[in-house]
């Protein structure tokens, strides 16, 4: 069994010994620490917390523990039930709550679950805030409410309709153009909450022809829930043998979006953000964009094509959001299909990603494959190197940066990013595993692989 504690929350596998995994005891301890932190921050005797969950098998069990612990800590709770991550984030601000807890392990397999923690803006906590909650949890520095001050469950209603109506109200979403285009769409929601949210969104957008795959929110994922090409053979085959205009694939909590073209070919998860950004930059006559250091260079190219400015952030949604606020970014996100559109909210949101992409598709008059051909074409490779426990990763990365300082532009905000004229490499230590990750991008898959192999060999030579 596994339990991983980090600044963004706690995640682990369900079951096992009392000292292992994400069990009722560790769940209650961490929830109590979060509630204590919120009470300290707000100075409120009864803070209001939103709780939402994806469709994982363990979701009901974890939900009961989390809500019960929050009540025991004197917090009031609005339980919005089965909900996407962005829906829960928007409910925090919509209900003027003091925080929120999302019960989801995102793209991890079904035996995993997690608690993701939000502030009163519906955004993930900062590094300092996360560390303080970990400290409170470890020290058990919290007190439960007495019997006269136990919290209450104020409501148990979905917030999905409010979320969808907010998407439709965006000036950049053209519902009439989408309706007139009369698209036939397919989607795969991997047996989680996307099976509830996507049909409702398509209906609101006037999309009448919908082919649904793995839409029943049972938590029994039909395939690996991470939306990568090797896991999406079913929807690709279904589209390739029918007259579908576009396919959408989401992960279990609907904050990542992958697109399939009309031939059943993978659009490229990195290019979800590129396409949506291209549309918004054109609509607004330019603007600033942000993605993390491991995301495709194509976003920078498209941004500069429209006269805008691109900025890279450290890996992690909270870092991307911080940089977006600093630069006043029009759009941002991550290369894993995460679209962050501040006009709606500061969080990755596949629902707004779908609405914006369908608007782009309708207005362009192009097929999805034709749209993809208008963007710069790059290929990526991802490698890893196991890190022995006695090795100082910081010293290793410092050595790498020094040796390559004259080879290209060096960025050290998150590991070592080396930008070369036609390619780049990003080497960073994993936040959750004892490994070093190597990301490369080049004009061809062969060149990206060669670059990754080169840097893997360099790192291994440091370890020998």
Where are these predicted regions, by residue range?
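Proline/glycine-rich low-complexity loops and linkers
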Residues: 134-165, 169, 262-335, 339-340
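Glycine-rich phosphate-binding loop of actin/hexokinase-like ATP-binding domains
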Residues: 101, 114-115, 119-133, 255-282, ...
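An N-terminal, well-structured beta->alpha segment
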Residues: 1-68, 72-73, 152-184
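N-terminal small/polar loop signature for handling phosphorylated ligands or for N-terminal nucleophile
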Residues: 36, 48-112, 200-260
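Phosphate-binding and adjacent anionic-ligand microenvironments
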Residues: 246, 284-464
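Gly/Ser/Thr-enriched, mixed-charge loops and adjacent short helices
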Residues: 13, 113-242
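Short glycine-centered, acidic/aromatic-flanked micro-motifs in structured strand/loop junctions
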Residues: 51-53, 187-189, 261, 343, ...
């Amino acid at each position: 069994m596994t339990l991983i504690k980090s600044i963004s929350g706690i995640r682990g596998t369900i079951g096992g010994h009392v000292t292992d995994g994400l069990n009722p005891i560790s769940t209650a301890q961490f929830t109590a620490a979060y509630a204590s932190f919120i009470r300290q921050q707000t100075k409120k005797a009864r803070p209001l917390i939103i709780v939402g969950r994806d469709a994982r098998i363990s979701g009901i069990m974890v939900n009961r523990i989390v809500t019960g612990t929050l009540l025991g800590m004197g917090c009031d709770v609005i339980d919005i039930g089965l909900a996407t991550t962005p829906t829960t984030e928007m409910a925090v601000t919509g209900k003027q709550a003091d925080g929120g807890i999302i019960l989801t392990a995102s793209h991890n397999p079904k035996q995993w679950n997690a608690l993701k923690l939000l502030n009163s803006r519906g955004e993930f906590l900062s590094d300092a805030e996360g560390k303080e909650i970990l400290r409170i949890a470890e020290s058990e520095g919290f007190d439960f409410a007495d019997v006269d001050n136990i919290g209450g469950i104020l409501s148990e209603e979905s917030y999905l309709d409010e979320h969808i109506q907010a998407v439709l109200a965006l000036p950049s979403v053209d519902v009439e153009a989408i309706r007139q285009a009369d698209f036939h769409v397919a989607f795969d929601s991997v047996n989680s909450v996307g099976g509830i949210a996507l049909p409702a969104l398509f209906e609101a957008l006037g999309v009448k022809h919908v082919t649904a795959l793995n839409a029943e929110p049972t938590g029994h994922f039909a395939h690996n829930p991470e939306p990568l090409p090797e896991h999406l053979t079913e929807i690709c085959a279904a589209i390739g043998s029918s007259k579908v205009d576009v396919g959408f694939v989401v992960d279990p909590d609907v904050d990542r979006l992958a697109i399939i073209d009309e031939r059943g070919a993978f659009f490229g998860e990195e290019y979800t953000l590129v396409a949506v950004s291209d549309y918004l930059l054109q609509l607004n006559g330019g603007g600033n964009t942000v993605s993390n250091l491991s995301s495709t260079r194509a976003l920078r190219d498209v941004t500069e094509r429209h006269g805008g400015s691109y900025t890279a952030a450290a890996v992690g949604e909270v870092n991307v959001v911080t940089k977006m606020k600093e630069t006043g970014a029009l759009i941002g996100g991550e290369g894993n299909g995460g679209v962050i559109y501040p006009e709606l909210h500061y969080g990755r949101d596949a629902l707004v990603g779908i609405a914006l992409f369908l608007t782009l598709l309708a207005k362009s008059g192009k097929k999805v494959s034709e749209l993809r051909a208008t963007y710069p074409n790059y290929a990526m490779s991802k490698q890893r190197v196991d890190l022995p426990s006695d090795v100082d990763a910081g010293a290793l990365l410092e050595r790498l940066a020094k040796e390559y300082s004259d080879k290209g532009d060096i960025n050290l905000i998150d590991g070592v990013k080396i930008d070369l004229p036609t390619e780049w490499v990003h080497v960073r230590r994993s936040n959750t595993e004892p490994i070093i990750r190597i990301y490369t991008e080049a004009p061809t898959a062969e060149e990206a692989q060669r670059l990754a192999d080169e840097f893997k060999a360099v790192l291994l030579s440091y370890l020998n």
